[in-house]
A protein has these predicted regions:
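Active-site and adjacent substrate-binding regions of carbohydrate-active enzymes
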Residues: 1-426, 434-456
């Protein structure tokens, strides 16, 4: 723990009131780390900690997540230069898991996290852990073997700890990290959900979202989805590939750029480049520049109600629940696009705006908090409850959740800026967001309205 932020004792105190997730950054190490300093100083035992490659090596087949050099030159203590593997940037140096010393050192880090009380272990950028020049160097068999090792160690040392893989890749590759349903991750990030919800909102058409959601399948009852809409990174576009045509992906990128979003690009093996990430707060991603605050909030609540209605475990990014807007000043000051959604606040700033019931922060925080509180009390929203998806025309998404005890929740979402009337849906129950009783076969939803109907 960085001394300026606290100590392990502070972490132990947090554990008393919350389940802790530790970010196990297993693919790479900071260029400012002690391990890398020892490597540069040529200290015995660190010779093979990082991956030195002849710059003449053909690495054209390697999957590149960013439009940056794969190899970065560094000067060692004796004056020699090594070109080291840097998948993401020159300040993140990839670890050499082919070295037994690295594997042992990283297992030691994992064991330390478990000892400090981690309930969840997030494996960061895990898909790139093993490198073989001439291959894509992503999703290799050896990488899956490493995850299986981490899972076996975790199960033996701290049974019940959940491993979550963070792989911002096309959906079919993402779900491979469940393994056989028992031997790799218990949860995977649901990376396709954030851009598909944006696609549905901006097109006012739920069909693609509904079709994809209806196809979701888990390999075992011991696995589930880690659902989210926003994070400290941008909104990944690779998870859309294979779900939407490339033309629709590029159309979404263009639309979001017009509304103020920034774009990060990746290099392709054929020399071209493609957009891989949209940088924007989710509040601004959902809205138009000229949207009223009321419409902005309504779209935002709709999207998060979808998140909270999906099978799996929902996660809400702090910038989202605080109703953050794009931080262009942060981008200019720090020099990278992801800063747009990483604004830092003082407690006083947040308190002032959350105590002003006319502020957009207050309205988003209070309404989203209410949704979360309602969800917690409903057994139909258990991660393992049955989920049935249906598109009613283009504009209405219907999700039915059925609990093990038979309780049913019907969620209706109007993905349009016009009132929509739903016919032929025989529903009897209570709408939980308004408290109104529902009966009959005809329902009218306002623009961007959500209904959670607990059936009698």
């Amino acid at each position: 723990v960085a001394p300026e932020t606290g100590s392990w004792q502070d972490v132990a105190e947090l554990k008393q009131s919350a389940s802790l997730m530790f970010d196990f950054v297993c693919n790479h190490m900071s260029a400012k780390s002690e391990w890398f300093a020892n490597y540069l100083a040529q200290k015995p035992g660190y010779e093979d900690f990082f991956i030195s490659v002849d710059p003449e090596t053909d690495l054209s087949a390697v999957t590149r997540p960013r439009a940056l050099p794969l190899l970065t030159p560094f000067t060692l203590n004796d004056g020699s230069v090594r070109h080291l593997w840097t998948t993401f940037s020159d300040d993140q140096i990839d670890l050499n898991f082919a070295s037994p010393q690295v594997l042992i050192a990283m297992v030691d880090v994992l064991l330390h996290y478990l000892m400090e009380g981690a309930r969840y272990i997030r494996l960061d950028a895990v898909g790139f852990m093993w490198k073989i020049p001439g291959t894509t160097c992503i999703h290799l068999e050896q990488t899956h073997c490493l995850i299986q090792l981490f899972r076996a160690i975790t199960d033996a040392v701290a049974p019940g700890t959940v491993i979550i893989t963070e792989t911002n890749v096309p959906h079919k590759d993402n779900v491979s990290y469940f393994g056989d349903g028992e031997n790799e991750a218990q949860m995977v990030y649901q990376f396709s959900l954030p851009p598909l919800v944006l696609h549905a909102v901006h097109r006012q058409d739920v069909k693609a979202l509904c079709r994809w959601a209806g196809s979701l399948a888990l390999p075992s009852t011991h696995t589930t989805w880690f659902n989210f809409l926003a994070s400290h990174d941008g909104i990944g576009l690779n998870p859309l590939r294979g779900i939407l045509p490339e033309s629709e992906i590029l159309s979404l990128v263009e639309k979001l750029q017009q509304e103020g979003a920034l774009v990060n690009w990746k290099n392709n093996p054929d020399g071209t480049r493609s957009p891989y990430e949209i940088n924007v707060t989710y509040l601004d991603a959902l809205s138009l520049r000229d949207s009223s605050d009321d419409e902005r909030i309504a779209r935002f609540i709709l999207a998060h109600a979808v998140l909270l209605s999906f099978p799996g475990v929902p996660a809400v990014y702090i910038q989202s629940i605080l109703g953050s807007r794009n931080d262009y000043e942060g981008v200019e000051r720090l020099g990278y696009n992801r800063a747009i959604n990483r604004k830092k606040y003082t407690a006083g700033q947040v308190d002032r705006e959350l105590n002003n019931n006319k502020s957009i922060r207050y309205q988003i925080y209070s309404r989203l908090s209410e949704l979360i509180a309602i969800r917690r009390g409903e057994s139909a929203f258990h991660p393992d409850s049955q989920a049935i998806f249906d598109a009613i025309g283009e504009h209405i998404l219907k999700i039915v959740r059925v609990a093990e005890n038979g309780e049913r929740m019907t969620a209706l979402f109007n993905f349009s800026n016009k009132m929509q009337t739903v016919y032929g849906q025989t529903l009897f129950g209570r709408e939980l967001l308004s408290g109104q009783d529902i009966s009959g076969t005809e329902l009218t939803l306002n623009p961007w309205q959500v209904m959670w109907i607990k059936e009698n």
